[in-house]
C-alpha cells in the first residue's frame, strides 16, 4: 500500500457516507498530497430491518464488517458514529480518534405537532431506541410507541406516509444531512438524556499501524474525548447493551466534567438517575463512579431483570 493512500471502510447509508466524507476532507486538509479512498459496504445492521436492534445483537451489527475489512488489510480505518461503537474491540484494533462533537440532543420531528407535550392521547411515536422509548413513556405513558428502523430518509418517509404522528431522531444526523428544517423541536438533555457518544464521530484503526495513527492525530478533539470516555465508562461498568435503556451525557465547564446518567425499565415505569462531578482528566473514573452509584440505587435489579428474560 502506498504511503500516500489511506482507505476508509464505511457503511453505505447517507449518514455514514457523510461521516466518511467528513473524515476524508479533514485528512486532505491536514495532509497535502494524501489520497483518501472510500470502501462502502453493507453491514448486518443495515440489512436486518424488520426486527428491533435489541433482539438481533445490538449496535455491534453496524461495525463488524468494517472491522473485518481492516483486519484483512482491505481498509486502513473505519469511521463510526460513537453511539454505535461497542465497548470491546477485536484484537489488533482500537479507537484511535474521537472528532469534535456535533449536537448531542434528540430531535422531535412531526408534521402536525410542535413537541411531545402537544401530542394527543394515544398518538403514535416512532423510535428504535429503548432509551428514548423509556424516557417518553415515563412522561407520557398514554402514547403508543412503535419501532422505527432504516436510514434517516426512510424514517422520514414513514412519518410523511402517515405511519406515525411523530418520530424521534438524533439531531446531529439531521443537521449533517442538511435536513435541519425537518426538526420541529429540539429535545433538551434534561428532557431526554442522550445515548453515550451521541453526536460524536470516532475513527478505528489497527493499533500497530503507526503511519495511519500519525495521519489521524490532527483530527482528535480532546474535550470530546473526555466527555465520551466518561459516558462510555459508565455504560461499560454497567455492562449495558441495547436491551436496557441507558442514557449518559457529560459536559465540561473550564476543567470540570459533569456526568449525568440514567438506567430505566423499558416500559418507563422506573428510572434511576445520578450525577457525578470531577476533573475532566478523571473522565474514566467519573464514569465508573457514576455507574456504581446507579447500581447501588437499584440499577442492578433492572439490569438483572432484563437480561434474565
From Swiss-Prot:
Catalytic activity, reaction form: 4 porphobilinogen + H2O = hydroxymethylbilane + 4 NH4(+)
Listed GO MF terms: hydroxymethylbilane synthase activity
Pfam families in the record: Porphobil_deam (PF01379), Porphobil_deamC (PF03900)
Keyword match Transferase: yes
This protein's UniProt keywords: Porphyrin biosynthesis, Transferase
Enzyme Commission identifier(s): 2.5.1.61
Residues the record lists as S-(dipyrrolylmethanemethyl)cysteine modifications: 242
Assembly and binders: Monomer.
Similarity comment: Belongs to the HMBS family.
Other remarks on this protein: The porphobilinogen subunits are added to the dipyrromethane group.
HAMAP family linked: Porphobil_deam
Protein name: Porphobilinogen deaminase
The organism of origin for this protein: Shewanella sediminis (strain HAW-EB3)
